[in-house]
Amino acid sequence: MSGRGKGGKAKGKSKSRSSRAGLQFPVGRIHRLLRKGNYAERIGAGAPVYLAAVMEYLAAEVLELAGNAARDNKKTRIIPRHLQLAIRNDEELNKLLSGVTIAQGGVLPNIQAVLLPKKTQKSK
C-alpha cells in the first residue's frame, strides 16, 4: 500500500502558478495580497493569474519605451527621466497614468508655436 489513493500518480516536482501561466510576476503573492487586502470576501483562482498577467504586460510596455528613451539619450541605465518621457509621449499610457507624478521625472520639452521666431521670406 503506497498511500497514494486509487491508482494515482506519484507527485512530481511542484510547479509554481506563475510558471504554469508562463508569467514572471508572482501569482501566489498577488493572490495572498488580494486575500489580505479585504477587496472581496472571496477571491477566484483565475483572478490573481489575470491580474499578474496585466501587471506584467504593463511593466514590459513601460520598460520597453523607457529603454528606447534611454538609448535615444545614449544612456545604458533607465532613470526616472526616461520613464517620464516614455509615459508622457505614449497617448494611452499618459491617459492611464495622468494622475501620477514621477519623482525626478522633469517635464516634456514643449514650446508654444506663438513664441517661436517667425520665419522670414527670402526674395531672390
UniProtKB/Swiss-Prot annotation:
Function: Core component of nucleosome. Nucleosomes wrap and compact DNA into chromatin, limiting DNA accessibility to the cellular machineries which require DNA as a template. Histones thereby play a central role in transcription regulation, DNA repair, DNA replication and chromosomal stability. DNA accessibility is regulated via a complex set of post-translational modifications of histones, also called histone code, and nucleosome remodeling.
Post-translational modification remark: The N-terminal serine is acetylated. That serine is also phosphorylated in approximately 60% of the molecules isolated from erythrocytes.
Assembly and binders: The nucleosome is a histone octamer containing two molecules each of H2A, H2B, H3 and H4 assembled in one H3-H4 heterotetramer and two H2A-H2B heterodimers. The octamer wraps approximately 147 bp of DNA.
Bias type Basic residues, positions: 1-18
Pfam families in the cross-refs: Histone, Histone_H2A_C
Organism for this UniProt entry: Sipunculus nudus
Lineage: Eukaryota, Metazoa, Spiralia, Lophotrochozoa, Annelida
Main localization category: nucleus
Recorded superkingdom: Eukaryota
Residues recorded with modification N-acetylserine: 2
Name of protein: Histone H2A
